[in-house]
Regions:
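Iron-sulfur cluster-binding cysteine motifs and their immediate structural context
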Residues: 2-9, 19, 26, 30-47, ...
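Mid-to-C-terminal Rossmann-like scaffold of FAD/NAD(P)H-dependent oxidoreductases
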Residues: 11-13, 316, 320-322, 330-340, ...
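Feature captures the FAD/FMN-dependent oxidoreductase FAD-binding
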Residues: 77, 138-139, 143-147, 195-243, ...
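Glycine-rich dinucleotide-binding loop and its adjacent helix/turn
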Residues: 121-138, 196-216, 238-292, 394-411, ...
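N-terminal Rossmann-like FAD-binding beta1-loop-alpha1 element of flavoenzymes
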Residues: 143-168, 282-290
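Rossmann-like dinucleotide-binding cores of NAD(P)H-dependent redox enzymes
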Residues: 166-210, 261, 286-333, 450-466, ...
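FAD-site-proximal beta/loop scaffold in flavoenzymes
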Residues: 247-271, 354-423, 427-430
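A conserved FAD-binding loop/helix module that cradles the flavin
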Residues: 285, 419-447
């Protein structure tokens, strides 16, 4: 029997009792899972298909396979699946802005799948030390220098090592990890999580040299001593307000404040703290100041409450912890009294953005206010440090790069992460590091640049590249399934540390999902278009109960030869007993074909 003949209409096939139209089928496999006789079975994974969540994940994770494994309690397999495209699931599972969830096909039904919490669950329960690594290629004997041990630099180092290159990472700080390790507070991202993932990178043979700042002279030597160089120095400085009084003692940049707390454990604040800014760094600083003993903490944001750039969840947690938020105000001047910080003069901000959506604050200078403060933390953005770079590489406040290859104007030098773009997030830095690794491998081995330039859909895939395909292999995004067919399912939310325990310690606030909750959440995933259409493996075994048609969320995908009113919902067991098989309303006896004579098939 030619099983493929039953996938689509085929005039040459004399008997086609049940068929699946691959143009309509969304490969959700509800039919195969509900089939009582195994007429339909699961098929192989579909090549090139990419779900909406995966298309919007900068790191290129195969989200559907993560939910598939967690659904079955296979947390180690889920962790291995994530690390095939992203070496930092422990970090991303805690602090990623998860754009994947905003594109989830389940949203029209109830709520999107909590893929961010599932990524963390894969790390928490997948025993990180046993997470398998992708196979390493034989050594190329090529040497690569990476400047900066943040998410972009370490990601590039991780995949360059897998691709067979000898990698040395130079980090100015006393620890590796970049922003996640140095600037995100312990209560959001424990140091032990970052350290364990840095150790995984080092386990591939990557030499990470901390306390190794690179100046212009040292950088010039690197370009001579190594076959290629990747610059990933990030944006390690706080931006200045540019107002009178900013140099008053007691005014500190947020990046420096967070670093002092994380590395030196000696950050100090007064009783009345004002944090300038409305982003995640501002909420981190405000919540940290409260934990360090400040009695009053106020955030002053140019943006309105609904346009603040900080994650809504972080704003809500800050307010729960007693942080006050003053929106639509800008700083006019910082005042001192007897040489000490005393207050801030504020002016009303009418709008933080122009009509094109660009950051361009406009003020009503006639509307003013004042706020007392003995500590001011400036969290209005981050700045790069390009003091080491060749002048040919500089483009304003960042390094000039080719957006496809991440090459700089200096041959053999590549750049990525925050230093090469104005779009700054950890997961986008990871994506940049992975793309750089592929581009550098092509440069070092004389490969074809077209694999990076191919017009695929979605993010870069190291797995596809190593398999000999294009770096962006996606070729289609499936239509959204009819979500109502799947039925509602309550989203599982992570447990949170109680308010009193939060503010009196640096313990992690988000406690994550339990194993059971993670499995339950994974089962909410539709796994859109994950596989090729089901195989109708044994068509002559079909009872025509109609369950597959009833369960199918894609009308017209399943076609039956029997008329609807003659589908059989009953079948005789070997004992002679009749039993119901799936239909909500089985047809009356006068409309049922005789048991044992269904399409020429004799039942026991």
């Amino acid at each position: 029997m030619n099983n493929e003949a039953y996938l689509v209409p085929n005039p040459a096939t004399p008997c086609q009792p049940i068929r699946i139209d691959p143009e309509i089928c969304i490969s959700c496999y509800r039919c195969a899972d509900q089939c009582r006789t195994d007429v339909m079975v699961r098929n192989s994974p579909k090549a090139g298909g990419i779900a909406r969540c995966e298309e919007s994940c900068p790191a290129g994770e195969a989200v559907r396979w993560t939910t598939y494994h967690i659904d079955r309690g296979q947390f180690e397999d889920a962790l291995e699946n994530i690390r095939a495209e992203n070496p930092f699931p422990g970090v991303c599972g805690r602090v990623c802005f998860h754009p994947c969830e905003e594109k989830c096909a389940r949203i029209p039904l109830d709520q999107g799948v909590g893929t961010n919490a599932l990524e963390r669950a894969a790390f928490d329960y997948g025993t990180p030390e046993s997470g398998k690594q992708p196979g390493k290629r034989p050594s190329t004997e090529k040497k690569v220098a990476v400047v900066g041990a943040g998410p972009a630099g370490l990601t590039a180092a991780y995949y360059l090592a897998i691709l067979g290159h000898k990698v040395t990472v130079f980090e100015a700080q006393p620890v590796a990890g970049g922003i996640p390790r140095i600037n995100i507070p312990e209560y959001r991202l424990p140091a032990s999580v970052v350290d364990s993932e840095v150790e995984l990178v080092a386990s591939l043979g990557v030499d990470i040299k901390v306390n190794s700042p690179i100046d212009a002279e040292a950088f010039a030597r690197l370009t001579q001593d190594y076959d290629a160089c990747f610059v990933a120095t990030g944006a390690p400085l706080s931006q200045k307000l540019g107002v009178l009084g900013e140099d008053t003692p007691g005014v500190i940049g947020a990046i420096e404040f967070l670093r002092k707390s994380r590395l030196d454990n000696n950050a100090e604040v007064g009783k009345k703290v004002v944090v300038i800014g409305g982003g995640n760094v501002a909420t981190d600083s405000a919540r940290l100041a409260h934990r360090l003993g400040a009695e009053e903490v106020t955030m002053v944001s140019l943006e309105s409450r609904d346009t603040m750039p900080s994650y809504e969840s972080e704003i809500a947690l800050a307010e729960e912890e007693g942080i006050s938020i003053s929106c639509s105000w800008g700083v006019n001047k910082i005042n001192a009294k007897a040489g000490k910080l005393a207050s801030l003069d504020l002016k009303s901000c009418i709008s933080a953005f122009d009509r094109q959506g660009n950051f361009s604050p406009s003020y009503d200078e006639s509307k003013t206010s004042s706020i007392a403060a003995d500590t001011v933390i400036v969290a209005i953005g981050q700045a790069t440090d390009l003091s080491f770079a060749d002048e040919k590489m500089k483009a304003g406040s960042r390094i000039e790069v080719n957006s496809n290859t991440l090459e700089t104007p200096v041959p053999g030098v590549f750049a990525g992460g925050d230093v090469g773009t104005t779009i700054r997030s950890i997961v986008q830095a990871i994506a940049s590091g992975k793309r750089a690794a592929i581009s550098m491998d092509i440069f070092l081995t004389g490969g074809d640049k077209n694999v990076l330039l191919a017009a695929g859909i979605g993010p870069t895939s190291i797995g596809s590249y190593m398999a000999g395909g294009d770096a962006i292999p996606g070729n289609h995004v499936p239509e959204e399934p009819e979500s109502a067919f799947f039925g509602p399912g309550k989203r599982q939310e992570p447990a949170m540390l109680s308010g009193e325990k939060r503010t009196n310690s640096m313990n992690e606030v988000n406690e994550g999902l339990s194993r059971e909750a993670a499995i339950s959440e994974a089962r909410r995933c539709f796994r859109c278009d994950q596989y090729s259409p089901p195989l109708v493996l044994y068509p002559d075994e079909c009872w025509f109960c109609g369950t597959c048609v009833e369960e199918c969320p894609a009308p017209g995908a399943i076609r039956m030869e029997h008329p609807l009113n003659q589908r059989v919902a009953w079948k005789r067991k070997k004992t002679g007993e009749l039993f119901r098989r799936g239909m909500k309303n089985p047809p009356p006896p006068n409309l049922r074909p005789p048991v044992g004579e269904i399409h020429g098939h004799t039942t026991p």
